[in-house]
Amino acid sequence: MGLVKEGADMEEGTLEIGMEYRTVSGVAGPLVILDKVKGPKYQEIVNIRLGDGTTRRGQVLEVDGEKAVVQVFEGTSGIDNKYTTVQFTGEVLKTPVSLDMLGRIFNGSGKPIDNGPPILPEAYLDISGSSINPSERTYPEEMIQTGISTIDVMNSIARGQKIPLFSAAGLPHNEIAAQICRQAGLVKRLEKGKHAEGGGEDDNFAIVFAAMGVNMETAQFFKRDFEENGSMERVTLFLNLANDPTIERIITPRIALTTAEYLAYECGKHVLVILTDMSSYADALREVSAAREEVPGRRGYPGYMYTDLATIYERAGRIEGRTGSITQIPILTMPNDDITHPTPDLTGYITEGQIYIDRQLHNRQIYPPINVLPSLSRLMKSAIGEGMTRRDHSDVSNQLYANYAIGKDVQAMKAVVGEEALSSEDLLYLEFLDKFERKFVAQGAYDTRNIFQSLDLAWTLLRIFPRELLHRIPAKTLDAFYSRDAAH
């Protein structure tokens, strides 16, 4: 047992590193309460040794005089007050990072689980991340091409954006996420007057994938998918399974984002971070909050959940003078398909839009079942247009939205008055609605459409209407693109 230093500097605290305690006074869920501890620090890492010799890691959550509350990442079963010893390390939780982490699989705590060699760290970084000076942030620009028409044309994702997938139980969000990982690449920005090129700089593109509370089937699906399509060497996987400790879910996204920050800002890579399932993360947060007996907020979630989610989502972006970027696509499953549930509700406030996966489209065998009407990308305007995608992109997107919305209204009206009462114009909108869903929204899981193919397909659908009904597209653009033999 270590000794307490005499006359130690008060600012540093009176705790000597390595001091061990046998003062466990209680266990509540994933928390251990310690008594008679000298100088514990908030967020300090502790090593817990059980009576049988096994060790676990924990983090100080709360300090009150000589009392400390520690959350244990590997769970609290087997911890007693007789044989359990707790050692304070004086360090915050850091994770080893290296370029060698690409192509590897780790558990939720960042330990390799793919039977590969240990990682030789190039640095140890605090998992909470470094604070970024807001004035050093660069506005997200340049489109990330996903190969999915509804996202690329109507909800374009900018490099450095954070945009979630709002899904629900039983919907194919995992398949969509895997498809995005397979097909994602940058659209190179070129000088005005030239066409942009789709999906460039793939060698500089990396994916960090963090799974929280997923079942073994989902974990195997992603692992197999990455290996089969040959993209595994640019992917780092962090897997916290449903049978892993709940508390580990709180650190998994932070370890993943710390790795992403290293790859982006130190190695100059364009990193796409996919976090699934943020609903499991929110439930883990609620569990810790309940164990600490905090006053619950809406539906039992803690009042600080908004702040906590922001500490994850706001770690996306670009920094002045650094070539790399972090783009985030968190996935969350809405309980009972309820978009007003605290998790999607607060997520929508923080992130820059959302992509909505729709059950009705899924029930009609349309894949990917992305409903464009409630979907939104707030930074789309800075990622598209001449020199970045094509000059007609914005107008085509607006016209597709307008016609699809009118088509939905006509469909509802048809259910009331019958098809005979509809005008010839209404019937055009119904034809557009059907073809839009069957040809534009629907595409195969391995069907990659670059942005130019998607825009050309959109024009094919818009030609259902006479020119005078395309109110959202300027005459100049119509002259260039409306006729079938227009030069693209």
UniProtKB/Swiss-Prot annotation:
CDD domains: ATP-synt_V_A-type_beta_C, ATP-synt_V_A-type_beta_N, V_A-ATPase_B
Family matches, as Pfam families: ATP-synt_ab (PF00006), ATP-synt_ab_N (PF02874), ATP-synt_VA_C (PF22919)
Keywords from the UniProt entry: Hydrogen ion transport, Ion transport, Transport
Domain of life: Eukaryota
PROSITE patterns from the UniProt entry: ATPASE_ALPHA_BETA
GO annotations of cellular component type: proton-transporting V-type ATPase, V1 domain
GO process annotations (BP): ATP metabolic process; vacuolar acidification
InterPro entries: ATP-synt_VA_C, ATPase_a/bsu_AS, ATPase_F1/V1/A1_a/bsu_N, ATPase_F1/V1/A1_a/bsu_nucl-bd, ATPase_V1-cplx_bsu, P-loop_NTPase, V-ATPase_su_B/beta
GO molecular function: ATP binding; proton-transporting ATPase activity, rotational mechanism
Protein family: Belongs to the ATPase alpha/beta chains family.
Matching HAMAP family: ATP_synth_B_arch
Role of this protein: Non-catalytic subunit of the peripheral V1 complex of vacuolar ATPase. V-ATPase is responsible for acidifying a variety of intracellular compartments in eukaryotic cells.
Subunit-level organization: V-ATPase is a heteromultimeric enzyme composed of a peripheral catalytic V1 complex (main components: subunits A, B, C, D, E, and F) attached to an integral membrane V0 proton pore complex (main component: the proteolipid protein).
Annotated protein name in UniProt: V-type proton ATPase subunit B 1
